[in-house]
Amino acid sequence: MFITFEGIDGSGKTIQSELLANYFKQIHGENNMVLTREPGGTDFAEKVRGILLKDSIDPVSELLLLISMRYEHVKKVILPALKKGKIVICDRFIDSTIAYQGYGLGVDLELIRDLHKLVKIKYPDTTFILDIDVQIGLSRAMDKNKYEEMNISFYNKVRKGFQEIAINEPDRCSIITEIEAKDNNQVHVEIVNKVTATKPVLLRK
């Protein structure tokens, strides 16, 4: 099972991915659970991550770099774990590229999707999208990067992108709303309840 967490900066997706990973470890054991992230996930991608999040480059060049890192990540980490029957949780994946590079920076959405199809990138089985007010999210963001220098309009476009992804792919995506009004445990419980309702097999030892 491949699960991803998505949302704008400060939405709490990183802590929620960690909480769900720890929850599954208690059920299935640490060796059957893989927690990873993007940009990153491999030695190569982690080295490039710092450059990607700090240096400004052309949006299409950025897209190509992200996809090359993702291909490496899927081939070396995600698919091998899934083939062994492990649960894989990833903090950001394809949807972040669609929302940030597509909706936010204006890269053609079909180009983004076609390039992923070209290199046969696997889509997640389940995606949790954490929706939060833009200004509150940015005030909470801990991992400062170049995107946080963008204006509110940029982040509103990114947020809209995530919302539209959730609407267009309801079988894969579950959107958690009003994050700003909930504490981390409340959000975690809501996510576990959604897993219980849609993927009960994950809760069996």
Swiss-Prot record:
Organism: Wolbachia sp. subsp. Brugia malayi (strain TRS)
Cross-referenced NCBIfam families: DTMP_kinase (TIGR00041)
Function (record text): Phosphorylation of dTMP to form dTDP in both de novo and salvage pathways of dTTP synthesis.
PROSITE patterns reported for this sequence: THYMIDYLATE_KINASE
GO biological process entries: dTDP biosynthetic process; dTTP biosynthetic process; dUDP biosynthetic process
Enzyme class: transferase
Positions in coiled-coil regions: none
Protein name per UniProt: Thymidylate kinase
A GO CC annotation given for this chain: cytosol
Matching Pfam families: Thymidylate_kin
